Amino acid sequence: MNLAAMDPTTYDAQLEAKRIKLEQAFAQFETPSIEVFASDPEHYRMRAEFRVWHEGDDLYYYMFDKALNDKVRCDQYLPASTLINEMMAALIAELKPNPSLRHKLFQVDFLSTLSGEILVSLLYHRQLDDQWRAEAIALKAKLSSQFKVNIIGRARKQKIDLDKDFVVESLQVNDKVFHYKQIENSFTQPNAKVAIKMLEWAIDVTQNSQGDLLELYCGNGNFSIALAQNFNRVLATELAKPSVDAAQYNIEINGIDNLQIIRMSAEEFSDAMAKKRSFRRLEGIDLDSYLCNTIFVDPPRAGIDPATLDLVQGYERILYISCNPDTLKDNLQQLYKTHKVTRFALFDQFPYTDHMETGVLLERIK
């Protein structure tokens, strides 16, 4: 974190610098003009994590500033949502005078939503007992007069949910509202308004699609649920069980009837498609019945592994969302031999950092 860089007056210049850097880095692929999707310059992050400092009777949040090489007190935090900032103040006021709730508390995590829900996780260097639970229940009751809040307590090999360990986000995407279960301690897009722009862009570039869609690394179904409207059927894979469970929940609450989630890794799915291995998890699913002309990938920072990249290259159209331009560039070295980049986007998920989220649509060269 570099707090000095978080200056809304410099936001536009910082975003333009990212665009230029991206354009230069991908010039060899003859990309079209970059479509740039800006963030709000402040209060854009829907989640935030803070360490907690104890100093006599005082108690406050802090972060480590790499530029200063020191901890920085954070009574408020410009990138965090307005809801998180409001909760930060209300929560610390309740924790300070409470010996049970503050004892060996070392971290607080916040997960907020545009829909108004917020989840607070309190992390401790001690085991949590019945007294802690009673005090946490009272804390939740008091905060609930102002917030739609749930509280979780965590310690080594211990997790206490007072009610539930998730929030439900609602995103207005074009003329539809999609609802997403977001689980504590699982991956979610941190910048909800930019996430909406990403979904709208993905829907736009896949309009008038033929056949079915295959998605790898689908997470909680964020993209596949929104894209289902553009395809006859969608087949999606995800390895993490909490994400698969959330995806199934999201499919149901959004009334999606043409989306099938399979719990397996991209590498395992590549083997299944190549008929190298059989999997019990695929019983009852006829892979050969899917006519997938389009594949959607949103891989981790490491990019796509070689075997999966070979699989991806076999599709007519490839929609690739990347959180790491370096590994995207590496993957394009192979994909560019058979496909042309026809759409290219920069999504500023993380203002005031070097991080760039990108999207490319590749279409097979005729």
From Swiss-Prot:
The answer to whether keyword Iron-sulfur applies is no
Q: Active site located where?
A: 323, 357
Spell out the PROSITE patterns in the cross-references. SAM_MT_RNA_M5U (PS51687), TRMA_1 (PS01230), TRMA_2 (PS01231)
Q: Which domain of life is it from?
A: Bacteria
Catalysed transformations (reactions): uridine(54) in tRNA + S-adenosyl-L-methionine = 5-methyluridine(54) in tRNA + S-adenosyl-L-homocysteine + H(+); uridine(341) in tmRNA + S-adenosyl-L-methionine = 5-methyluridine(341) in tmRNA + S-adenosyl-L-homocysteine + H(+)
Which residues are recorded as binding S-adenosyl-L-methionine? 189, 217, 222, 238, 298
Q: Which GO terms describe its cellular component?
A: cytosol
For this protein, what is the EC number?
A: 2.1.1.-, 2.1.1.35
Query: What does the record give as the function of this protein?
Result: Dual-specificity methyltransferase that catalyzes the formation of 5-methyluridine at position 54 (m5U54) in all tRNAs, and that of position 341 (m5U341) in tmRNA (transfer-mRNA).
Q: Which NCBIfam families match?
A: trmA_only (TIGR02143)
Designated name of the protein? tRNA/tmRNA (uracil-C(5))-methyltransferase
Organism of derivation = Shewanella oneidensis (strain ATCC 700550 / JCM 31522 / CIP 106686 / LMG 19005 / NCIMB 14063 / MR-1)
User: What taxonomic classification does the UniProt entry list for its organism?
Assistant: Bacteria, Pseudomonadati, Pseudomonadota, Gammaproteobacteria, Alteromonadales
Gene that encodes the chain: trmA
